[in-house]
């Protein structure tokens, strides 16, 4: 293979992730790479919540079009931005090692969620974070926050918010870990499906490339991500509902923790299950939670 062209969004975090994959391909597979950057609709439409404008697929469509038109061979994504169902002909070809999956509490004035005064304004665009935060502290005011990491931090620094919630992984990767005031325990805020994992998307028809990319695959990331995504798929969850799932691998045993909540955080259901087949585990836990009223909670 002469060269691999990688499609990427233009943000600093997207380029960090893409360069991470590029460097691994070049050093471990000995194949030269180039990066092709592009803006997605998710990057352009910043004045509306994601759940109102089409969801996570808005961060991927342009990259997938580039692959279909032979302008790129693969695309690199943050797995939490990848819908549970990919368009026909696409697949997830390689999972990178997971960074810290927890949500991060970021504030210039307060040390933790517990330190926030009544009525404090917290910024997040995630229904999952909003619901869990309100369940823990129903006296807070949650306001939407869109944009890349730098934009969100500048809005905090300008005084628009008392605190904001971001993914720890992105801040760590951009060497902004000093901005994290508190790593939020998963007992308070269960992470998004796939949070902290960088993934490579490719075309199913490209067997030669898939075989090469598979050599970069992190087995642990792949197994825990498969469990989390199977849970999400069984529930048919997207960014328009408050769903969280986080799996840990110990030897061959996977512990999957999951949460569904109403958007106001007043109703919440959490469950845990252990198994060794990630797809089966995710489906079984989702079915158990559906039997316990998960859909009614998500609709409320």
Swiss-Prot record:
It catalyses: 4 porphobilinogen + H2O = hydroxymethylbilane + 4 NH4(+). GO terms for cellular component: cytoplasm. GO terms for molecular function: hydroxymethylbilane synthase activity. Binds 1 dipyrromethane group covalently. Pfam families: Porphobil_deam, Porphobil_deamC. Its EC number is 2.5.1.61. The modification S-(dipyrrolylmethanemethyl)cysteine is found at residue 239. Monomer. Tetrapolymerization of the monopyrrole PBG into the hydroxymethylbilane pre-uroporphyrinogen in several discrete steps. The porphobilinogen subunits are added to the dipyrromethane group. Belongs to the HMBS family. This is Porphobilinogen deaminase. It comes from Francisella tularensis subsp. holarctica (strain LVS).
């Amino acid at each position: 293979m002469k060269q691999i062209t990688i499609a990427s969004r233009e943000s600093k975090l997207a380029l960090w992730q893409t360069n991470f994959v590029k460097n691994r391909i070049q050093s471990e597979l000995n194949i030269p790479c180039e990066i092709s950057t592009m803006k997605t609709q998710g990057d352009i439409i910043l004045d509306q919540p994601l759940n109102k404008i089409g969801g996570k697929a808005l961060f991927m469509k342009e990259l997938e079009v580039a692959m279909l038109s032979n302008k790129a061979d693969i695309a690199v994504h943050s797995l939490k931005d990848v819908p549970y169902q990919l368009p026909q002909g696409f697949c997830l070809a390689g999972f990178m090692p997971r960074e810290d999956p927890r949500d991060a509490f970021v504030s210039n004035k307060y040390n933790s969620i517990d330190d926030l005064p009544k009525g404090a304004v917290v910024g997040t665009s995630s229904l999952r974070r909003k619901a869990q935060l309100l369940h823990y502290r129903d006296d807070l005011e949650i306001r939407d926050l869109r944009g890349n990491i730098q934009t969100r931090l500048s809005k905090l620094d300008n005084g628009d918010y008392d605190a904001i919630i971001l993914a720890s992984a992105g801040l760590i990767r951009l060497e902004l870990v000093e901005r994290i005031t508190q790593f939020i325990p998963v007992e308070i805020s269960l992470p998004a499906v796939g949070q902290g994992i960088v993934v490579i998307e490719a075309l199913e028809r490209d067997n030669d490339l898939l075989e090469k990319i598979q050599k970069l695959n992190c087995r642990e990331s792949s197994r825990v991500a498969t469990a989390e995504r199977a849970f999400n798929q069984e529930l048919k969850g997207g960014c328009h509902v408050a769903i969280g799932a986080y799996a840990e691998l110990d030897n061959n045993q996977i512990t999957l923790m999951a949460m569904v909540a109403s958007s106001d955080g007043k109703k919440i259901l959490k469950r845990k299950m252990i198994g060794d087949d990630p797809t089966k585990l995710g489906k079984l836990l989702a079915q158990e939670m559906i039997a316990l009223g998960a859909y009614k909670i998500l609709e409320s």
